[in-house]
Curated annotation (Swiss-Prot):
Enzyme Commission code: 6.3.2.4
A single GO molecular function term of this UniProt record: D-alanine-D-alanine ligase activity
Protein name stated in the entry: D-alanine--D-alanine ligase
Co-factor remark: Binds 2 magnesium or manganese ions per subunit.
Gene of this entry: ddl
Cofactor: Mg(2+); Mn(2+)
Amino acid sequence: MPLSTVALIFGGKSTEHEISIISAKSIAAVIDPFRFQVLPLYITHEGKWFTGEFAENILQLDLAEMLRSTSLDATGNTLRQMAMHTGQQGFDFDFFKAGIDLAFIALHGSYGEDGRIQGLLDTFGIPYTGCGVLASAVAMDKALTKLCVTEAGIATAPGITILSSEYFADPKSTQKSIEEQFTWPVFVKPASLGSSVGISKVHHIGELIAALETACRYDSKILVEKAMQGREVEVAVLGNNAPEVSITGEIEPGSEFYDYADKYIHNAAKMYIPARISPELQEQVRKDALRAYKALGCRGMSRIDFFVDETSGTIVLNEVNTIPGFTDISMYPRLFAASGLPFNELVEKLLQFALETPSGARS
């Protein structure tokens, strides 16, 4: 029986390019070689697609160590230089039509989690891991996510959405509006980025301008939210029609909030599995995670993040991540490992769920 060819798609044009490579490397290492032939498919920062030897070489890099020992910019420049001097031709899209049986999407952030790659694969009739176009696009936009889950009865942080064009047209009016509607601190964040890129915690009016301008560099839609008290609790969800929900996990940031450097460079955050909350709150968080998953029309997988205040018993949804990290420090695979599902079996299930869903039949 011939092996099924899995296109492992990684890299991409987002700010999470390097993390995508680390995730893909972990995934490639555990895909069953007796069932699947892995075709690494690397997308450069500039959007050029490569397979073959060059993509294989990218997967062999120790990106985690490069990020720790140099910087994000330096690591990105190294990858760009490799792409410029590979001497290899870009990917032939005609191969999509006949040479790929399914795709494992390991792209994070823009162009990977926002429905664009999903739409391309639907067009070619190729099954793929994770959510479909609509669920991906909505979950990527934190403002739209808030609207959807609020409709389903799930609490979110008080917040407002600001367009960058509105801010630059009248900065003082925007600042005044925020000051009138919120008490400090607040979070200012791009609506559609992951890994805490572009997010600032603002403690007083003097920090607001810099935070808004930072967020505007990354997105045309900005979300301002009240900073919530409590523990950062995460839940992993897996499946299509009958999703499984993992036990809870907790992130204790090494700095004031769990930012990109904390996650991937300094490795300063602490993880607790299960989360250090009461059994009753743990069960409610798991129920809310499943409700959010269904409300957004998710399939395959998602990691759903909350703030939990044990004193008041308040549970507030923070965000839904439809392609969570698969690095060795990522919470999603750790949560399922702690729930009794090893990493290799998790990847196997994701591939199986992809094959269960005909292309174009998911939301």
